Amino acid sequence: MQAFDLYAILPELVLLIATCLLLVASVYVPERVTPTLGVEQDVFHTPRGVGFVYFFTIIMLVYLVFAFVGRMGDPALVAMNGLFQSDPFSNLLKACSCIAVLISLIYSKQYLMDRDLFRSDFIVLALLALLGQFVLISGANLLTLYLGLELMALPTYALVAMRHNSEKSVEAGIKYFILGALASGFLLYGMSMLYGVTGSLDLIEIFKVVADPRVNHLVMAFGLVFIVAGLAFKLSVVPFHMWVPDVYQGTPTAVTLMIAAAPKLAAFALLFRLLVNTLLPLLGDWQPMLVLLAVLSLVVGNVTAIAQTNVKRMLAYSAIAQMGFVLLGMLSVFDDHAFSASMFYAITYVLTTLGTFGLLMVLSRKGYDCETLDGLKGLNKKHPWFAFISLVMMFSLAGIPPTVGFVAKLGVLEALVDAEHSFIAVIAVIASLIGAFYYLRVIKVMYFDEPEHEVTVSGSGFAKGVLSLNSILVLAIGIVPAGLMSLCLDAMRRTLLGS
């Protein structure tokens, strides 16, 4: 292994070694407090063993965030004999993924403790999934992409089914596993067809062969269908979306957040690496597929969400529609502004999702999960600050100024108009107007309905502070979006140019 290989994969090595050490340590430390064992608690009010794992994980994730941010100005590196690439695009997405997992753990701690689920295996599985996201985001080879995808997916299957005494959780885990395996099979079959035609697993070599007009494009187009189908499942877009509502609703909210936030960034990276970096010469084949998937997702997601009374199920259909917007940004022909708009949308959607599910966990307590609209009734009368946080998140998801969601949607719509897809932009606007109904309905029940039962707030003061900062960021980036936009544009431009 050469020196620059080690430098390129150093954060991944740190995460891998630390996760393995935590996995071994978790075998020898007490997991929970029981009357018979009388396990002593630490300053975090958790069993000492789990508290150590939790604290060490938080410190490591903070280090990784700074490590990736510090690499933003580095030139692109291809390491490990072409298997792995480190570029501004991957460094930005990996930093955002670290932040997403970090915030998810902070929000989840009290929620999991109240349900006797705050165990070291939850943290280790989350870290393994994060490692898979890193490998997937930096994949420069079909084999690396697939291994990263599976390393990300397998721990999430276990997370979804971790509440084994709940029928809904087990059912959601089985559905997620079976459909996820099917989607992985689609993706692997499509990749094998690409390999059969091009004779290479390297993305750069595949691009060169695909760009050759003498190559049989019919076979590649056939494989492309399977690749897009696999990507559609990972992005949870129509018609490969049927698992999303059941998984969101059937799992503990902390687990829902783990699969609803950071993995979306990795799925976006997979979409970009395969379709733009590798299969851009087949634009005429995959662009109509993305148009169909995006429009169906916008319409089906927003219309179906109107009928939902379970907030998590509503947010599942909302996620389907939001991913439709991400796909719309990929329709422009080699336009770095359009691709960066799509990247900006994915990052800001994850930021808003963190705040939304974080609020649901703060409003939950031992023996009660805040998951329905009835549970939010009258929130403003009891806890006006948290009602305001929810208002900010709903405004952002709906795309209402001055939140970041408005800026993100506007950027994608501008890219569509510039690419002469005005009709699709009109459909997207109409779908967003439909979607605004159920977001505003949440605000209505919080501010104008009378509470049906006692509304309480749980969670540590630190978690509440992070949630408040989360909502402030959603507003601040919406008012001053230039910083994050320029980061996305610079990362996308340098990645496309290979510098």
Swiss-Prot record:
One cellular component term (GO) for this entry is: plasma membrane
Enzyme nomenclature, EC number: 7.1.1.-
Compartment(s) where it occurs, according to its Swiss-Prot or TrEMBL record: Cell inner membrane
Which terms in the Gene Ontology molecular function aspect does this entry carry?
NADH dehydrogenase (ubiquinone) activity; NADH:ubiquinone reductase (non-electrogenic) activity; quinone binding
GO biological process annotation, one example? ATP synthesis coupled electron transport
Q: Which organism is it from?
A: Polynucleobacter necessarius subsp. necessarius (strain STIR1)
Q: What does this protein do?
A: NDH-1 shuttles electrons from NADH, via FMN and iron-sulfur (Fe-S) centers, to quinones in the respiratory chain. The immediate electron acceptor for the enzyme in this species is believed to be ubiquinone. Couples the redox reaction to proton translocation (for every two electrons transferred, four hydrogen ions are translocated across the cytoplasmic membrane), and thus conserves the redox energy in a proton gradient.
Whom does it interact with, and what assembly results? NDH-1 is composed of 14 different subunits. Subunits NuoA, H, J, K, L, M, N constitute the membrane sector of the complex.
What is this enzyme's class at the first EC digit? translocase
UniProt protein name: NADH-quinone oxidoreductase subunit N
Entry keywords, A to Z:
Cell inner membrane, Cell membrane, Membrane, NAD, Quinone, Translocase, Transmembrane, Transmembrane helix, Transport, Ubiquinone
Identify the domain of life. Answer: Bacteria
Membrane topology designation: Multi-pass membrane protein
Q: Which HAMAP family match?
A: NDH1_NuoN_1
Q: Where are the transmembrane segments?
A: 9-29, 49-69, 88-108, 122-142, 143-163, 177-197, 218-238, 252-272, 280-300, 314-334, 343-363, 386-406, 423-443, 472-492
Which reaction does this enzyme catalyse, per its entry? Answer: a quinone + NADH + 5 H(+)(in) = a quinol + NAD(+) + 4 H(+)(out)
Family classification: Belongs to the complex I subunit 2 family.
